[in-house]
C-alpha cells in the first residue's frame, strides 16, 4: 500500500509539472462525482400568517432590568397586545424606556400593576432571581405572565411556580427567544415536524455571547450591571443562556422526559469577577433524542454581532444547520437554514418569514390554550438547566 501511495504521488507530481494536471477528473484525487443537487430558496409565510391579529389584550411591564424586554413587548404587540402601563426601578432603564414609549403610563409600584384589573398579561425582565417570585404574585392576582429567560433560577422557585399554576390555572410563559423569535429556528421546527429529516436523533447548540456590545437590545449595549456578574442573581451560565438551548433540545427532539448526563462550568478569563462563569457545556438525554450544548462569553468584535449562534439537528434521513445571526465571512444577515436530505442539499433564506409566537401567545391568553408554548415543556427546560447548573463540575484551566 505504501508503494502504491508513493507511485501515485510521483505520478501526480510529474503530470503537474507538465501541465496535464488540470485535465484529470476529480475521481483521480479521490473525490466522488456529484450525486445530489443544490437548491437555494427564500421561505415565505402563508397569507393567513401575515393577517392582522385576531385578538387584543392589555398588558403591562413590571421590571425592565434587561433590554430583552423590548423584544418581548414587540412580540406581544404583533399579537394584538396594547401596552398600557409599566414599572421599573433602575433610573437609566426607566429613562430609555420612556423615550421609546412616551405614551405609556408609568406607575410607581408593582402593586399598581398587580391590582389593575384591566391588565391581562404582565411581562418582566427584572433581575433573574426575582422573576419567578414576581410571576407567582402575578398569577395569584389573576393575570398571565411572560418572563425573560431564565424564568426560574432554583428548584424551590420551580416548585412554587408549578403549585401556583395548578391553583390559579394561569399561564407562566418564558421567552426562549433564540427559538421563538428567530425565523430560521421556527422554520427548522416546521421542517422537522413535517418529517423532512426523519426522526430526530440529536441536537447540538453552540451559543457564544458577547459581554460588551456597541448597540442593540441584547443586553450589553450600555455595559453590564452588577447583578450580571453574580450567579446567585443571574442563575449561572447554564441556567441563564443555557435555557434557550435546552428549550430547543426538548422542542426539536419532542422529548417529554429528559435528564442532564453531565455539565461543567468555568471562569477562564474574567479574574476581576471570580464568581462569574464565562464558559459552560452540558450533555442531555431525552426519551426521544440526545442533546449537547456549549455556551460562552467570548464572541470577538470582528464578528459584527453579539454571537454566532448555531443549531445542528441530526435526523435519520438528513440533517439541518441553522446559522441564526450571521453567516461568518459570507454575509452579515442571519436566519440562514441549511438542510440536507436523501435527495438534495438546500439553503433556505428565512428572513421573510413572519414570527408566530406573539399572535399565538395572545390567542392562548384569550382562549386558555397552550399553542405558542407548551407549559410542561417550558418548565421542564427550566428544571433541566437548574439541575445542570446545580450539579456542574467547576473546571480550572491552567494558564
PLM feature spans:
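N-terminal secretory signal peptides
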Residues: 1-7, 31-33
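C-terminal helix-rich "cap/oligomerization" subdomain common to oxidoreductases
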Residues: 13-53, 121-123, 360-399
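Short acidic low-complexity segments
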Residues: 105-115
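Predominantly a Rossmann-like dinucleotide-binding segment in NAD(P)-dependent oxidoreductases
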Residues: 55, 67, 171, 180-273
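Beta-strand-loop-alpha-helix segment that lines the small-molecule cofactor/substrate pocket
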Residues: 121, 127, 132-180, 195
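Contiguous beta-strand/loop segments that form the cofactor/metal-binding neighborhood of enzyme cores
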Residues: 40-49, 247-327, 357-368
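Active-site loop of classical SDR/Rossmann-like NAD(P)-dependent oxidoreductases
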Residues: 67, 89-92, 348-359
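N-terminal Rossmann-like dinucleotide-binding module
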Residues: 19-22, 29-101
Amino acid at each position: 500500500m505504501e508503494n502504491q501511495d508513493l507511485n501515485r504521488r510521483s505520478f501526480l507530481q510529474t503530470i503537474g509539472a507538465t501541465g496535464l494536471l488540470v485535465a484529470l477528473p476529480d475521481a483521480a484525487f479521490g473525490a466522488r462525482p456529484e450525486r445530489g443537487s443544490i437548491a437555494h430558496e427564500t421561505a415565505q409565510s402563508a397569507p393567513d400568517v401575515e393577517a392582522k391579529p385576531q385578538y387584543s389584550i392589555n398588558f403591562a411591564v413590571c421590571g425592565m432590568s434587561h433590554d430583552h424586554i423590548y423584544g418581548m413587548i414587540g412580540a406581544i404587540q404583533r399579537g394584538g397586545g396594547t401596552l398600557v402601563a409599566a414599572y421599573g426601578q433602575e433610573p437609566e432603564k426607566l429613562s430609555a424606556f420612556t423615550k421609546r414609549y412616551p405614551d405609556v403610563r408609568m406607575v410607581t409600584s408593582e402593586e399598581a400593576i398587580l391590582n389593575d384589573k384591566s391588565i391581562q398579561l404582565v411581562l418582566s425582565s427584572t433581575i433573574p432571581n426575582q422573576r419567578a417570585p414576581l410571576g407567582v404574585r402575578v398569577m395569584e392576582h389573576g393575570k398571565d405572565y411572560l418572563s425573560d429567560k431564565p424564568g426560574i433560577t432554583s428548584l424551590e422557585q420551580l416548585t412554587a411556580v408549578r403549585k401556583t399554576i395548578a391553583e390559579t390555572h394561569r399561564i407562566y410563559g418564558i421567552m426562549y427567544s433564540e427559538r421563538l423569535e428567530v425565523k430560521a429556528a421556527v422554520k427548522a421546527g416546521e421542517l422537522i415536524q413535517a418529517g423532512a429529516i426523519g426522526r430526530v436523533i440529536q441536537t447540538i447548540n453552540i451559543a457564544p455571547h458577547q459581554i460588551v456590545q456597541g448597540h442593540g437590545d441584547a443586553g450589553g449595549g450600555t455595559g453590564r450591571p452588577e447583578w450580571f456578574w453574580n450567579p446567585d442573581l443571574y442563575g449561572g451560565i447554564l441556567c441563564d443562556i443555557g435555557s434557550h438551548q435546552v428549550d430547543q433540545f426538548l422542542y426539536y427532539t419532542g422529548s417529554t422526559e429528559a435528564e442532564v448526563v453531565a455539565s461543567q462550568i468555568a471562569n477562564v478569563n474574567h479574574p476581576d469577577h471570580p464568581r462569574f462563569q464565562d464558559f459552560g457545556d452540558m450533555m442531555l438525554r431525552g426519551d426521544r433524542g440526545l442533546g449537547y450544548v456549549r455556551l460562552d462569553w467570548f464572541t470577538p468584535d470582528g464578528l459584527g454581532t453579539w454571537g454566532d449562534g448555531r443549531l445542528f439537528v441530526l435526523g435519520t434521513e438528513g440533517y439541518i444547520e441553522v446559522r441564526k445571526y450571521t453567516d461568518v465571512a459570507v454575509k452579515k444577515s442571519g436566519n440562514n437554514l441549511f438542510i440536507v436530505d436523501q435527495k438534495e442539499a438546500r439553503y433556505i433564506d428565512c428572513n421573510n418569514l413572519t414570527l408566530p409566537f406573539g399572535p399565538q401567545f395572545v390567542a392562548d391568553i384569550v382562549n386558555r390554550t397552550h399553542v405558542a408554548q407548551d407549559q410542561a415543556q417550558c418548565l421542564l427546560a427550566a428544571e433541566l438547566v437548574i439541575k445542570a447548573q446545580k450539579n456542574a463540575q467547576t473546571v480550572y484551566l491552567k494558564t
